[in-house]
Design a protein with these regions (language model features):
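Cleavable N-terminal signal peptides of Sec/SRP-targeted secreted and luminal proteins
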Residues: 7-25
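Histidine-rich, glycine-flanked metal-binding segment
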Residues: 26-49, 53-98
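Divalent metal-coordination and catalytic microenvironments
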Residues: 52, 70, 92, 103, ...
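Metal-associated gating/positioning segment near the N- to mid-region
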Residues: 85-158
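Alpha-helix-loop-beta-strand connector modules within alpha/beta enzyme cores
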Residues: 96, 146-161, 210-225, 387
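Histidine/acidic residue-rich metal-binding segments in metalloenzymes
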Residues: 175-356, 361, 372-373
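His/Asp/Glu-enriched, well-ordered alpha-helical/loop segment
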Residues: 246-275, 328-329, 349, 355-356, ...
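C-terminal cap of metal-dependent C-N hydrolases
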Residues: 370-374, 380, 430-496
Length: 530
């Protein structure tokens, strides 16, 4: 980087352009190789996992699990099988539902570039880390939902595991309202995201948010918000730049926790006004968490999703003297000061926050360097889809903050219930999809960009170690991760449609009726003589 600083600025831009072009010309550059087997596109037949502790969200038992044609057939002790069955010995290990990541951005156009992980490399990383399904955010094309959906369907053709879609809403008119109906009724989308940040691009105003909340409620779809005050963030960025602070630390300084807390509170109150369930994505601060806690205590239906970066990191990396190191930590909302992480862990342990995502949105160091000299141009996003299951085990289970059954709930089951795909996903029960992991609580892991499966050349969790390692991943009845080897095939993943009206909508109609009955209006008055 020192040599870059001595170069004339136009040459720096030219060098960056050349590097970026080279990166896009070689789509597999920097990606750990995996074995590809065309026969893996169909279910690999019969599997018996024996002698493990089978863990669901509310129960664990020592039992065998028999899988056939991609489905769990039986869960009980001492299952006898023939020689044509692959047997996995899970003695002393946990057999759990594969992780479900509710928050990812694969191959997303953002801030003048495209996230470096696509539906092949990002999902490969997920499987190596024990996640067997994710839900990605579709970004409309010029506000058009159908065009955005078609684009993501095309991107996802290379999928190697199951996935679903959320849909972002970036503008409002009658056409968008009609398209939301289409997305829910025909395309299997039951959640819509509203950005309260990114002024001038994705950001919506309160009027649009209100209309969106009303529409979501009528469709039985869950409204989601990226909660930061976008107007104040823009002012904060201007203020920090005027102070001469242009490096990655300026990103955190320009969008402090109070702006996340304010937007979270505003979204919660507007959702209360409409009586619609609300899902707050990537809760990164005490300020936002406390607003969610107050709302839930009052009985409001609010879901809080922390992400693994906010639970396990602090903002100190943003002050690193090396630009590449500091820039890799830039995401929004920002990673916060030490103390916020522990508070979020405690909120997750006590049920204030319900499930863990990643906001996996990766850019390589070349892409991050677009913001050298102006933090506002650093593409926002970090990795996490491969690291989530390991880091949450180490941070929450090894520390005895939560139980093993809680771990299954926050990494898999709760997500499946919120998005209405339980018990097909998020459980090991007869008839459930055979998306299963075997985790060895005594094995250790170490995280490094040199060994991960993401295409990114950096890793925000670099050097982190711990106990609790996923040794086997089964996706759709296929063993795709075993003995440190991936065996995947492009196109083997399935799109999972998610029906509307999850449990979060139970009792909504009754609450509305009670509200109307409480108004004692209109009052019938006699005409007065004037």
């Amino acid at each position: 980087m020192a040599s870059l600083i001595r170069m004339p600025y136009p040459l720096i831009l030219l060098l960056i352009l050349i590097m970026a072009t080279a990166s896009h010309s070689h789509p597999m550059q920097g990606f750990c190789s995996v074995e590809s087997d065309p026969e893996l596109t169909s279910s690999s037949g019969k599997i018996l996992i024996k002698h493990g502790t089978v863990v669901n969200a509310h129960h664990k038992v020592v039992a065998d699990v028999y899988i056939e044609d991609g489905v769990v057939v039986s869960v009980r002790p001492n299952i006898a099988v023939g020689d044509d069955v692959k047997v996995i010995d899970a003695t002393g290990k946990y057999v759990m539902p594969g992780g479900i990541d509710p928050h990812t951005h694969m191959e997303m156009d953002f801030m003048g570039t495209v996230t470096i992980d696509d539906f092949y490399t990002g999902q490969a990383a997920a499987l190596a880390g024990g996640t067997t399904m994710h839900i990605d955010f579709v970004i409309p094309i010029n506000g058009n939902l159908s065009a955005g959906f078609a684009s993501y369907v095309e991107k996802a053709k290379k999928s190697v595991m199951d996935y679903g879609f959320h849909m972002a809403i970036t503008k409002w008119d009658e056409a968008v309202s009609k398209e939301m109906e289409l997305m829910v009724k025909e395309n299997g989308i039951n959640s819509f995201k509203f950005f309260m940040a990114y002024k001038g691009s994705l950001m919506i105003n309160d009027e649009l948010l209100l209309k969106g909340l009303e529409k979501c409620k009528s469709l039985g779809a869950l409204a989601m918000v990226h909660a930061e005050n976008g107007d104040a963030v823009a002012e904060g960025q201007r203020r920090i730049i005027d102070l001469g602070i242009t490096g990655p630390e300026g990103h955190a300084l320009s969008r402090p926790p109070v702006l996340e807390g304010e937007a979270t509170a505003r979204a919660i109150r507007l959702a209360s006004f409409i009586n619609a369930p609300l899902y707050v994505v990537h809760v990164m601060s005490i300020d936002a968490m406390e607003e969610i806690a107050k709302a839930r205590k009052s009985g409001q239906r609010v879901i809080g999703e922390p992400v693994v970066s906010g639970l396990t990191l602090d903002e100190s990396g943003l002050w690193d003297s090396d630009f590449t190191t500091a820039a890799k930590f830039v995401m929004s909302p920002p990673i916060r000061k030490a103390g916020h992480d522990k508070a979020l862990q405690n909120a997750l342990a006590t049920g204030i926050l319900q499930l863990v995502g990643t906001d996996h949105c990766t850019f390589n160091s070349t892409q991050k360097s677009f913001g050298y000299g102006d933090f506002r141009k650093i593409p926002n996003g970090v990795n996490g889809i491969e690291e989530r299951m390991h880091l949450i085990w180490e941070t929450m289970v090894e520390s005895e903050k939560i139980t093993v059954t809680d771990y299954v709930r926050i990494t898999s089951t709760e997500c499946a219930k919120i998005f209405n795909i339980y018990p097909k996903k998020g459980a090991i029960l007869e008839g459930s999809d055979a998306d299963i992991i075997v985790l060895n609580p005594n094995a250790s892991f170490r995280i490094s960009a040199t060994s991960h499966h993401s295409r990114s050349d950096t890793n925000v969790y670099e050097g982190k170690t711990g106990k609790g390692k996923v040794e086997v991943t089964i996706s759709g009845g296929r063993v795709v991760w075993e003995e440190g080897n991936l065996k995947i095939t492009s196109g083997s993943g399935k799109y999972i449609k998610m029906p509307p009206f999850s449990y979060l909508f139970d009792g909504i109609d009754k609450a509305d009726a009670n509200y109307l009955a409480s108004l004692h209006s209109p009052v019938h008055r006699t005409a007065a003589a004037f």
